[in-house]
Amino acid sequence: MHKFITHLQDTPSYSPPGHSRTTNRRLLAPGTAGSNRFEVVLGQIEFGGQADPHAHEKTEQAVFVLEGKAAVEIEGETEIVGPNDLIYFPRGVRHAITALEGPPLKLLIVYAPPLSSPKVL
């Protein structure tokens, strides 16, 4: 296996703190394919699952919706998002995501700089 290629089946799954019915896989992060400047995560949230309100103090986050629909709350305002929508969370901006009825919410998530650990938000 090439050191710059990550195979999904080789990545362990985890549920971040403050998230329910969520499964994430770190595709690119320090310690995987060698990136030190950003992190790429594939996430899935089942219907009714959510990322509780939180903010990332040291990192920016971009979330691209691959499948499903979600209610996204950003600084107290809520909007519905679906496939092909991109959500951007600047550092320190409080946000939450709730998966809506239908297929699981599948997300491609980018953090810059990377989170220090999958257990830290």
Predicted feature descriptions by range:
Residues 1-37, 119-120:
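A short, N-terminal "cap"/entry segment at the start of jelly-roll beta-barrel domains
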Residues 26, 41-56:
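Conserved short histidine dyad/triad with adjacent acidic residue
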Residues 30, 51-57, 98-100, 119-120:
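Short histidine-centered beta-strand/loop micro-motifs
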Residues 42, 88, 103-118:
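A short hydrophobic beta-strand segment most commonly corresponding to one strand
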Residues 53, 72-73, 89, 95-102:
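Short beta-strand His + acidic residue motifs that chelate non-heme Fe in jelly-roll/DSBH
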Residues 76-91:
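Short acidic-glycine-tyrosine-enriched beta hairpin
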